[in-house]
Curated annotation (Swiss-Prot):
This enzyme scavenges exogenous and endogenous cytidine and 2'-deoxycytidine for UMP synthesis. One of its GO terms (biological process) is cytidine deamination. Binds 1 zinc ion. Keywords: Hydrolase, Metal-binding, Zinc. This is Cytidine deaminase. The lineage of its organism: Bacteria, Pseudomonadati, Pseudomonadota, Gammaproteobacteria, Vibrionales. The keyword Zinc applies. InterPro entries: APOBEC/CMP_deaminase_Zn-bd, CMP_dCMP_dom, Cyd/dCyd_deaminase_Zn-bd, Cyt/Deoxycyt_deaminase, Cyt_deam_dimer, Cytidine_deaminase-like, Cytidine_deaminase_bacteria. Homodimer. Its EC number is 3.5.4.5. It comes from Aliivibrio fischeri (strain MJ11) (Vibrio fischeri). Residues 50-170, 189-297 form the CMP/dCMP-type deaminase domain. Belongs to the cytidine and deoxycytidylate deaminase family. Its cofactor is Zn(2+). The gene is cdd.
Length: 297
């Protein structure tokens, strides 16, 4: 049994009997942190829990995906997409990498939903109050004005109540927002499957400020490939690089992120910044033998 599955089963064991019985077939060795709208409705009926109570009860399962070798502080988040599906996320840290590369649980859950094709988030449930960094990150979303935030033992509140007089994309003349469906039509002639997958990700990236349209693909020792696209933020610092989104993709797919063996990064040369140097250094900290292909379009 993997460490992740052990954590999931430990979390399951602490749930009310009716909920545990209904969840057990779902939380199997193939579970990748997604609960469909239909599954959620079935769990709610079986457990007789309210929508809020059920989401809060599921948080320990989301936190089981946490990778926190520095803080040993496990945070879970559950983002509900506009489809009604729920996406787990958890904080991620890396030894020997500067703390700015850390992924917060809210960023993880939202990235997970983005990877799965969601175009907006209706609500997010978190086991600890969102930090200012995450409040600003969420304010980039297409649904920032209507997004609701649920914490344990508190009433649900809007993001705008957590971030009064907020600064966001509209203040910089940007319409749309993070998770808006995009296709930038970047093109690259290559025989590399990894570069092609990174290009697909770059074409979905959100980079209205630096115009650094960028995406990455990671190949793991298992042979599986995971991708990520750049999620830029109006406040700049809360931006989430493509590598971090790809690492969320891998982690929520039950991969050990230390087993990345090769990567490919694609960027638009017209961008005002580059992810190349920080991507190289972070990958090398995960695996000193990793190889990185790079294309500047």
């Amino acid at each position: 049994m993997t460490r992740l599955q052990q954590r999931l089963e430990e979390a399951l064991a602490n749930l009310p009997d009716a909920l545990r019985t209904s969840l057990t077939p779902i939380i199997n060795a193939e579970f990748k942190g997604v609960i469909s709208k239909e599954q959620f409705q079935s769990l709610q009926a079986d457990s007789e829990l309210s929508d809020k109570e059920l989401r809060l009860a599921l948080l320990p399962l989301a936190a089981a995906f946490s990778v926190a070798p520095i803080s040993n502080f496990y945070v879970g988040a559950i983002a509900r997409g506009l489809t009604g599906n729920l996406y787990f996320g958890a904080n991620m840290e890396y030894n020997d990498v500067q703390l700015g590369q850390t992924i917060h649980a809210e960023q993880s859950a939202i990235s997970h939903a983005w990877i799965q094709g969601e175009t907006g988030i209706s609500d997010i449930t978190i086991n600890f109050s969102p930090c200012g960094h995450c409040r600003q990150f969420m304010n980039e979303l297409t649904t920032a004005d209507s997004l609701m935030v649920q914490l344990p033992e508190r009433n649900e509140k809007s993001l705008q109540e957590y971030l009064p007089e907020s600064f966001g994309p509209k203040d910089l003349g940007i319409e749309g927002g993070l998770l808006a469906p995009l296709s930038h039509n970047l093109a690259l002639e290559t025989d590399s499957p990894l570069l092609r997958k990174a290009l697909e990700a770059a074409n979905r990236s959100h980079a209205p400020y630096s115009h650094n349209l960028s995406g990455i693909a990671l190949e793991m020792e298992s042979g599986e490939v995971y991708y990520g696209m750049y999620a830029e933020n109006a406040a700049f610092n809360p931006s989430l690089p493509p590598l971090q989104v790809a690492l969320v993709h891998a982690n929520m797919s039950r991969e050990d992120i230390l087993t990345v063996k090769s990567a490919a990064l694609v960027e638009d040369h017209k961008g005002a910044i580059s992810h190349l140097a920080i991507t190289q250094s972070t990958l090398e900290a995960l695996n000193p033998d990793v190889t990185l292909e790079y294309a500047s379009l």
